[in-house]
């Protein structure tokens, strides 16, 4: 059996494509990717015994921190009762009620296993409900790894779907239209040209899969106004933002009520889950009540539901957002201050307990702005911070997250490391 990270990764390379089971974990700028043995609170512990302050937090689900005792106890109780029934359970009803009481647009809900599944079924549902073919998505918005939405924008204001991945048939994306994010004029144009044929507009109300891009209010309001005008459905993909930016999600922050919402991450408390929900008349089309098919052996898995229910109830008990948001605020202020004192151009974006930073001048409002950032310098920053015990997200195209476990002492240590890293970067630059 492999005894250290290098040996284990060598074995992994022979077993998994690229040595990992999700591409972002590859961390190709490091000699070996991060290999974790255990976690507690705000900390990860690697297979080589290194303790790290974690700002990835499982890429978002762990808003309470690792191994929160209430969630751990809920999972233990669930496992003691049994772990799969193929039947309705009390906890899934209770979790649905907790979601509905916070995200009021979700009048009915269907639990699935991933965010990808949630969006995939929501697209089918929208087409079934409207009888239309086209869907519209935005450049840089990620809605899961399935063919209809795994497309990017080409040149011009709007483009026919262009597959992002090998293996996707052009026919699979010929009814997917892609529009630049934060561009109201382009969105208006695509609705003028195709509005009567559009079934669904999908949007990340806060883009969290191309770094962190916060929308202009005019833009996000236009998504609702145009879909209502042309009779299309509006889907807010809140897999990341649901229960992260507040109890009411991003739709609560912006005061917009979408027709459909997709959720994941936090509603599973760190266990696999996804959900799509929305207007009662739309959701009533789902089997067995209606003709739009969805099924799954592991839908509303008892352990995932137990963890999610415990997580949301802890959030609702108070204090979680205050700690997590303050931690993110202090860290982003420290990054801005240290970068300025060291002579680096930097753009820092934060909303609630989500943040990301970019080595560039100007602002970041579109995916093109993210691409224009100095990715090499970000990776150098990441490597330097990691060597000092702080694990920021390993790509400028991802997002950092804080949690209720990021206490003032943890943040103090993080700020000390940030200051050290910028001093080291300044020395290397000269």
From Swiss-Prot:
GO terms for cellular component: cytoplasm. It catalyses: (S)-4-amino-5-oxopentanoate = 5-aminolevulinate. Its EC number is 5.4.3.8. Its cofactor is pyridoxal 5'-phosphate. The keyword Isomerase applies. Belongs to the class-III pyridoxal-phosphate-dependent aminotransferase family. HemL subfamily. This is Glutamate-1-semialdehyde 2,1-aminomutase. The gene is hemL.
